[in-house]
Each structure stands twice: as C-alpha cells, then as structure tokens.
Amino acid sequence: MSMDFSALAQQFTEFYYNQFDTDRSQLGNLYRDQSMLTFETSQLQGAKDIVEKLVSLPFQKVQHRITTLDAQPASPNGDVLVMITGDLLIDDEQNAQRFSQVFHLMPEGNSYYVFNDIFRLNYSA
C-alpha cells in the first residue's frame, strides 16, 4: 500500500465532508454499483441510489464538524476502515446533532472507493 492508511483516512474524510457540505450530488464518483449505504434504517445499494438518497435529505445547508477520526487496515489487500464521530449543523439550527459514520474503503487502481457506508445520528438517552 503506497499511502499510509491514517493519511488516506484523513484525506478521504476532508474530501468527503467538504463535498457533502457543498454539493452532495457530486459524491457519486466515490461509490460503485456494489457499494452499500445504511443511512439510519434505510439500506441502499449502488452509486445511483445512494446519491439519490443523499440528495433527497430534507435540508438545504449542512455542515459536518469532525470530532474523532479512527482508521485501521481492513485486509491485506489495502482496504481501510474509517470511523468518524462529530456534529452536524443543519440549515440554521443552533443545536448540533451528534453523528457517527463508518466507511469501508476499497482500493481501485491508484485510488479508493466507498464499498460500505454506515451513517447514524446519535440521540441523547
């Protein structure tokens, strides 16, 4: 693996959330037909359905603030697991919502794509 998995995770995370927060319709190139998204209780497969779900989310403005980022190699083939926690500011809400997200990144040529993506809001008990 040419890139350190921690550096890859950091670079991916910055790119993903910057793109999500500015124009989430452009995230499709990060997914493939076999990619899967679990968003709360919805499960979607394939780049087209995943992007349709992300675009359909009921907010105009969003800002992710990352609190923690953890990464591990996921296989001898160069896969990387990335777990993120943070705050989500939606539209003009003052109170942020906590979230967790896990990505399973798969190598493809000289880059990576999202094989699995699990997103969950974390509500207070």
From Swiss-Prot:
Residues 8-121 form the NTF2 domain. CDD domains: NTF2. GO terms for cellular component: cytoplasm; nuclear pore central transport channel. Gene3D superfamilies: 3.10.450.50. It is found in: Cytoplasm. Keywords: Cytoplasm, Protein transport, Transport. It holds the Pfam family NTF2. Its main location: cytoplasm. The keyword DNA damage does not apply. Disulfide bonds: none annotated. InterPro entries: NTF2 (IPR045875), NTF2-like_dom_sf (IPR032710), NTF2_dom (IPR002075), Nuclear_transport_factor_2_euk (IPR018222). One of its GO terms (biological process) is protein import into nucleus. PROSITE patterns: NTF2_DOMAIN. Facilitates protein transport into the nucleus. Could be part of a multicomponent system of cytosolic factors that assemble at the pore complex during nuclear import. PANTHER family: NUCLEAR TRANSPORT FACTOR 2. This is Nuclear transport factor 2. It comes from Eremothecium gossypii (strain ATCC 10895 / CBS 109.51 / FGSC 9923 / NRRL Y-1056) (Yeast).
